[in-house]
Amino acid sequence: MMRRQQIMDAAKKVFAARGFGGATIESIAEEAEFSPATLYLYFNSKDDLFASLNLTMLQQLTSKMEHVRDQALSPQKKIDELARALYEVYLLDPLNVVNVLRYQSKERLQRLSPGLSSQISDYTRKCMNTLAEIFEKGVRNGDLLDRNPAAFADIVWSLFSGLVLWEDTKKGFGSGKDLLQPTLELALEVINRGIKKTDVH
């Protein structure tokens, strides 16, 4: 188990420094101080290794979403907490989160070993269902617009993904200031106001 974690820690560094395309099993093995053959004992391919990091992020994200969902808060307060929770997931490992979001694709999922592919699909579904459940009670109680909670979840996830990737892109333009947190909070505030149900007189 320690070897597997050591390999994943090394992979995080190499993917962060070189990106998915520039990383190789050999460079990851060198960083981990193992032979490439040792890496293949734990991971079938570079894709599987990268996806294992993806799975870790999904597990952390799902845990944060479940915490927000289970709090005894109003729907509006939960949406405020959602912005904080998403940013906390990003802070756990910013470069890995960026890489994971940048390289998500159906084609990549199809290249994974069946067991890992199934795990990622299951956790993605669980994460999005939990995100939808944060909105579900508010819709049911009439506090939020009567729309599909899954659509709200898709909007929030798209916003988070887009903002993370855009902030990373801006760094390439020489913009050194990280505005992800205030921008994410503003985006969720706009959503919060927009989906709040108001009485029409």
Model-assigned labels for residue ranges:
Residues M1-M2, K13, D199-H201:
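N-terminal intrinsically disordered/low-complexity leader segments
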Residues Q6, A10, V14-D48, S52:
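Helix-turn-helix
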Residues A17-G21, Q71-A72, D93, N141-G142:
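Short coil/turn segments at alpha/beta junctions that flank glycine-rich nucleotide-binding fingerprints
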Residues S52, T56, E66-N96, A153-V156:
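Hydrophobic alpha-helical connector segments
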Residues Q59-T62, E66, R111-N141, A150-D154, ...:
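Amphipathic alpha-helical packing segments from all-alpha helical-bundle domains
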Residues L91-G115, E167-T169:
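Amphipathic alpha-helical segments used for helix-helix packing
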Residues V97-N99, V139-A187, D199-H201:
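Hydrophobic/aromatic-rich alpha-helical bundle segments in the mid-to-C-terminal region
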